[in-house]
Amino acid sequence: MWYVPYSTIRLLVSVTQHCEYCIDFNAGILLNQLGVTPEQLEAMKQNPENAPLNEKEKSLLVFVIKAVSDSNSVSEVDIQALRRKDCTDLEIFDALAHGARQVSGDILLNAFKVEKDF
C-alpha cells in the first residue's frame, strides 16, 4: 500500500527542495517499478492533488508538502482534517517523518553537488 505514497512523498518533497538527483531517482521508481505513467508523474509535479493516490493518501501527501515547505503554517486544524479522513496519528507522524528525512537527504545531495549515477 505505501510504496507509491512514500515514493510520491519523496518525489514531491524533492521538487520543493530542487534536488534534481532525488527527483529523477524517485521518478524512475514511480515510472519503472510502480506503474505510474509519465502523464501522471508530470501532473503530480505540477499539483500534488493530481497524484494517483486514494483520498486518504493524497491528504497525507498534501499535508507533508505543506509542512516541509513551512512547518510553522501547520495547525491543529490540519491535523484534525487528517483525522476526519481516518488518518491515525501514527500515519500522520510517519508520513511527515518520511518527508522530513527526505528534506535532509535533499540538502546533503544539493550541498555536496552529488551527480546522478544512474
Q: Where does each model-flagged region fall?
A:
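Hydrophobic alpha-helical segments
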Residues: M1-F118
